[in-house]
């Protein structure tokens, strides 16, 4: 487990990988910068009403089969039954007005499902960092668990984003350039740029590092038997 930090205002922050989540925290911020929650934010910006976070590819396909109007997306190359891939560059031109998206990714959706019993689950990346921090400042929880989804909690881009949001949530100034620089030099960014992964657009890394591109936060909560992500409007101070 990565070390916890208590800031001078009293917010206790814990940074963990998915395997270390354990008992459901009261408040969880699930971070996946490259690319699940950057993609989710873009989906909402393109008009999606909600995103169902699927636990497996089979579940995603079953949800799509149950309602063919749903838009199913996944990591990697496009495969039968899916409509889109987990790429902000490829998704940013999609018309998702009023649609329900079903998302299954390697890390982000897994992390959100791991904390589904938390009283508040925020899903985040740099594109919604300040909005996420404002929700935390408004709620002023005593304890916040940041789930660093990539590389079992060691992904530089996710940890940088989590620590940035934690500082902003505590009301501290933060050198955004330093945090973004760490993310830009991460293994995930390198693999995306070098074409190691499939289902990638050349602009993906740049889009994932657009700080505060969107004014909303993203809140996941159980609805019936599903974990559903929705945008949450956050008034600017």
Curated annotation (Swiss-Prot):
Domain of life, per UniProt, equals Bacteria
Q: Name one Pfam family in it.
A: 2-ph_phosp
E.C. number(s) listed in UniProt:
3.1.3.71
Is Zinc among the key words of this record? Answer: no
rRNA-binding keyword on record: no
Keywords from the UniProt entry: Hydrolase, Magnesium
Q: Which reaction does it catalyse?
A: (2R)-O-phospho-3-sulfolactate + H2O = (2R)-3-sulfolactate + phosphate
UniProt protein name: Probable 2-phosphosulfolactate phosphatase
Q: What is the lineage of its organism?
A: Bacteria, Bacillati, Actinomycetota, Actinomycetes, Kitasatosporales
Q: Which gene is annotated as encoding this protein in its UniProt record?
A: comB
